[in-house]
C-alpha cells in the first residue's frame, strides 16, 4: 500500500512540475522549450502514461475489493439481524449466516 501511494505522489509532483514549467516566462519565446530535458516537454512520455494506467488499475482493484467486502459484510449483517434475538434456530446455530444452506437446513 505504501509503494502505490508513493508512486502516485511521485507522479503527482512530476505532473505539477510539468504543468508549471509549461507556462513561458516573460521575455522568453514559447518555442525554446524543445531543448529542455524530456520530462519537461509538453507531451507526457510512455513512462508517465504507464504510471497513470498503473495507478488507475491499483485504484480500481482496491475499490472493487473494498466494495465486495462491504457488500459481503452488509449481507452478513442482514442475515444476522433477520433472526429474532433470544430464540434459538433449529439445527446448527450458525446456519442462518451461511448462504449455502439457509433454507434447506432449517426448513
Curated annotation (Swiss-Prot):
Keywords: Early protein. Residues 20-46, 75-107 are annotated as: Disordered. Residues 77-86 have a biased composition (Basic and acidic residues). It comes from the Viruses. Residues 98-107 have a biased composition (Polar residues). This is Probable protein E4. It comes from Bos taurus papillomavirus 4 (Bovine papillomavirus 4).
Amino acid at each position: 500500500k505504501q509503494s502505490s501511494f508513493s508512486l502516485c505522489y511521485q507522479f503527482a509532483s512530476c505532473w505539477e512540475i510539468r504543468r508549471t514549467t509549461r507556462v513561458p516566462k516573460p521575455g522568453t519565446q514559447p518555442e525554446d522549450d524543445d531543448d529542455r530535458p524530456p520530462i519537461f516537454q509538453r507531451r507526457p512520455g510512455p513512462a508517465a502514461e504507464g504510471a497513470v494506467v498503473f495507478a488507475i488499475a491499483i485504484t480500481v482493484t482496491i475499490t472493487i475489493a473494498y466494495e465486495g467486502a462491504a457488500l459481503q459484510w452488509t449481507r452478513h449483517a442482514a442475515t444476522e439481524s433477520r433472526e429474532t434475538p433470544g430464540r434459538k434456530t433449529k439445527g446448527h446455530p450458525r446456519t442462518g449466516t451461511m448462504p449455502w444452506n439457509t433454507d434447506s437446513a432449517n426448513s
